[in-house]
């Protein structure tokens, strides 16, 4: 029996989909004004892992996510670079796909841009005005928070204790346009010569919160099974989504709210605003094992924070290599025809332990413990010298399938060995860098490049890949 921790109730609850065997799932996507950082990737990986487990359990998962492609940050970046907002958004949407592909994140069933649903947004906002939940003020439209009966549920705060402008997206002067400081923008008046649309209230653009409500309703229906995102989105973003969606439809918006924890650097949340972030784009260019990055992100329970560092990444790689090595040892062992019932029973026991762990709000620590029991079994089976082909294949199948729930692939693939000349040049370059002979270091880097290999320097040392 699958149980999930529901942020709305702060309890683990038995998971019961609206339609048996089918799951509707919405997860908030990035604002595309820059490359995604490791913290953004953590959310994508966490919910990809949850999605993979639901698929493993036999559910049909309809997974929808968004790109916020109209926002002050995008407008500001476009003005800085002298290009259109669409050019900025398109550039970083392309980068998102390029950066998430090596991390083995399954593409969403539907992934849409906010600018693609503007007519739907205008219709949604108009309905809220008609029902008295929203009002127009000088070309903008705002939601009446105090009219929503359960506002603040996800924040677990009284209405009076909620922080005005908690999203950090409150425009200067916006407070003066509101009936109540807690009211939030559904549609923003836009007098500048930037991206905007005609509406019944004048030219403007949507507020941040409305797009996810519209996309979820449009592609998944009035009520969905799971809504996910980072814990920082619980208030105000998801709180506002819930309020406006339930006001619009008169129905419960989400059955289960799931939120992932932060990625921290030196015990402080990684964020672009703090400047303590590492982009996935940078990391992938300097680190040659994307599956180790994925393993680091998925080996910690999704609700717990991760303290990111190069040493933690290296620790994750070492752990993953234990699985890879055991898998390859057994794969390449000498088999005898037949099976071993005792081995098969041990495999079944660990598979059941994996399911039991993941059914407990996706307890990856206990699930990994089951996988490592299979790893130990694989090694001891090879050491026994009496490996039966059917039992060996079952161990291999289960290791690959279970670690595949974590999104880890390529267990059979060995890292490509480097030509001896490249290895020699790398050693010379490492010596030059230790001696701070930067000129020689650069010359050796260029020589390596001329031979078809690119060298990047990182806190993990020299990383080299074939061009």
UniProtKB/Swiss-Prot annotation:
Cofactor binding note: Binds 1 zinc ion per subunit.
Record flagged with keyword Metal-binding: yes
Recorded superkingdom: Bacteria
Residues bound to ATP: 272
Catalysed reaction equations from the record: tRNA(Cys) + L-cysteine + ATP = L-cysteinyl-tRNA(Cys) + AMP + diphosphate
EC number of the protein: 6.1.1.16
Subcellular location(s) of the protein: Cytoplasm
Chain location of the short sequence motif 'KMSKS' region per the record: 269-273
Gene3D superfamilies: Cysteine-tRNA ligase, C-terminal anti-codon recognition domain, HUPs
Motif placement: 'HIGH' region: 30-40
GO MF entry, a single one: zinc ion binding
Keywords, sorted A to Z: Aminoacyl-tRNA synthetase, ATP-binding, Cytoplasm, Ligase, Metal-binding, Nucleotide-binding, Protein biosynthesis, Zinc
Recorded family membership: Belongs to the class-I aminoacyl-tRNA synthetase family.
The protein's assembly and partners: Monomer.
Protein name according to UniProt: Cysteine--tRNA ligase
The species this protein was found in: Oenococcus oeni (strain ATCC BAA-331 / PSU-1)
């Amino acid at each position: 029996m699958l149980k999930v921790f529901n942020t709305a109730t702060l309890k683990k609850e038995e998971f019961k989909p609206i339609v048996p065997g089918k799951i509707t799932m919405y997860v908030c996507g990035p604002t595309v004004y820059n490359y995604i950082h490791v913290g953004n990737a953590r959310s994508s990986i966490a919910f990809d892992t949850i999605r993979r487990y639901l698929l493993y359990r036999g559910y049909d998962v309809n997974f929808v996510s968004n790109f916020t492609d109209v926002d002050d940050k995008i407008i500001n970046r476009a003005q800085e670079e002298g290009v259109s907002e669409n050019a900025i958004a398109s550039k970083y949407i392309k980068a998102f796909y390029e950066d998430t592909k090596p991390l083995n994140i399954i593409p969403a069933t539907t992934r849409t841009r906010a600018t693609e649903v503007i007519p739907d947004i205008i219709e949604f906002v108009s309905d809220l005005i008609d029902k008295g939940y929203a009002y127009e003020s000088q070309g903008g439209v705002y939601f009446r928070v105090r009219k929503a009966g359960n506002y603040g549920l996800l924040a677990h705060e009284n209405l009076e204790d909620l922080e005005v402008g908690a999203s950090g997206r409150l425009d200067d002067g916006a407070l003066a346009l509101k009936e109540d400081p807690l009211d939030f923008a559904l549609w923003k008046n836009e007098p500048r010569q930037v991206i905007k649309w005609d509406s019944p209230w004048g030219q403007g653009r949507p507020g941040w919160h409305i797009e996810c409500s519209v996309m979820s309703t449009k592609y998944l229906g009035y009520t969905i099974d799971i809504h996910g995102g980072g814990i920082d989105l619980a208030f105000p973003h998801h709180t506002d989504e819930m309020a406006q969606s339930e006001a619009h439809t008169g129905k419960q918006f989400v059955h289960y709210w799931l939120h992932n924890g932060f990625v921290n650097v030196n015990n402080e949340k990684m964020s672009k605003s703090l400047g303590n972030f590492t982009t996935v784009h940078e990391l992938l260019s300097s680190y040659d094992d994307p599956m180790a990055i994925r393993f680091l992100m998925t080996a910690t329970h999704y609700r717990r924070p991760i303290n990111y560092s190069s040493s933690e990444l290296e620790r994750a790689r070492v752990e993953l290599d234990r699985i890879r090595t055991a898998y390859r040892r057994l794969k390449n062992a000498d088999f005898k025809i037949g099976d071993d019932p005792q081995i098969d029973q041990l495999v079944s026991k660990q598979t059941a332990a994996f399911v039991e762990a993941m059914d407990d709000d996706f307890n990856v620590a206990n699930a990994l413990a089951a996988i490592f029991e299979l790893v130990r079994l694989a090694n001891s089976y090879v050491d026994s010298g009496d490996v039966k082909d059917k039992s060996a294949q079952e161990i291999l199948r289960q290791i690959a399938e279970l670690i595949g729930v974590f999104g880890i692939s390529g267990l059979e693939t060995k890292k490509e060995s480097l030509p001896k000349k490249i290895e020699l040049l790398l050693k010379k370059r490492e010596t030059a860098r230790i001696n701070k002979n930067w000129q020689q270091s650069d010359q050796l880097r260029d020589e390596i490049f001329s031979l078809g290999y690119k060298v990047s320097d990182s806190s993990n040392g020299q990383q080299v890949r074939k061009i």
